[in-house]
Amino acid sequence: MIQQESRLRVADNSGAKEILTIRVLGGSGRRYAGIGDIIVATVKDAIPGANVKKGEVVKAVIVRQKKEKRRADGSYIRFDENAAVLIKPSGEPRGTRIFGPVGRELRDKKYMKIISLAPEVL
């Protein structure tokens, strides 16, 4: 459950290390975002010399969340941290590598490039 003011780790090599959620996209009064949802965020911590700067407003897709997610088959999935991948306006990831596992829900939301770059899909 990612909401406004939630801080997330960035799971790619775009240069950002931590982001803070500004808005959850997908409806006027939408409060929470889960795996596969898009958020608008600001970069809170970045690597010096990277193409993403601190204070920059970016879009990101959630790839891991601490809150357990119930799947259609009745199983639950949860991760140790909240993490996101920065995306371009076209929906492609800004980085060229993804770190850590990602949720299978990304496949249903058509983020095939993120799925193919990820080392593990759970």
Swiss-Prot record:
The family database entries (PANTHER family) matched by this protein are listed as: 50S/60S RIBOSOMAL PROTEIN L14/L23, LARGE RIBOSOMAL SUBUNIT PROTEIN UL14M
Which Gene Ontology terms of cellular component type are present?
cytosolic large ribosomal subunit
Q: Does the keyword Transcription apply?
A: no
Q: Which terms are listed as keywords in the entry?
A: Ribonucleoprotein, Ribosomal protein, RNA-binding, rRNA-binding
Q: What organism does the UniProt record list as the source?
A: Saccharopolyspora erythraea (strain ATCC 11635 / DSM 40517 / JCM 4748 / NBRC 13426 / NCIMB 8594 / NRRL 2338)
Show the stretches that span the lipid bilayer: none
* Name listed for the protein in its UniProt record: Large ribosomal subunit protein uL14
What is the top-level taxon of the source organism?
A: Bacteria
Query: What GO biological process terms are annotated to this protein in UniProt?
Result: translation
Q: Could you say which protein family the record assigns here? A: Belongs to the universal ribosomal protein uL14 family.
Concerning SMART domains, the annotation shows: Ribosomal_L14
The cross-references to PROSITE patterns, in alphabetical order and at most eight, read: RIBOSOMAL_L14
Q: Which Gene3D superfamilies match?
A: Ribosomal protein L14
Oligomeric state and interaction partners are given as: Part of the 50S ribosomal subunit. Forms a cluster with proteins L3 and L19. In the 70S ribosome, L14 and L19 interact and together make contacts with the 16S rRNA in bridges B5 and B8.
**Molecular functions (GO terms):** large ribosomal subunit rRNA binding; structural constituent of ribosome
Q: Provide the gene name from the record.
A: rplN
| Function field | Binds to 23S rRNA. Forms part of two intersubunit bridges in the 70S ribosome.
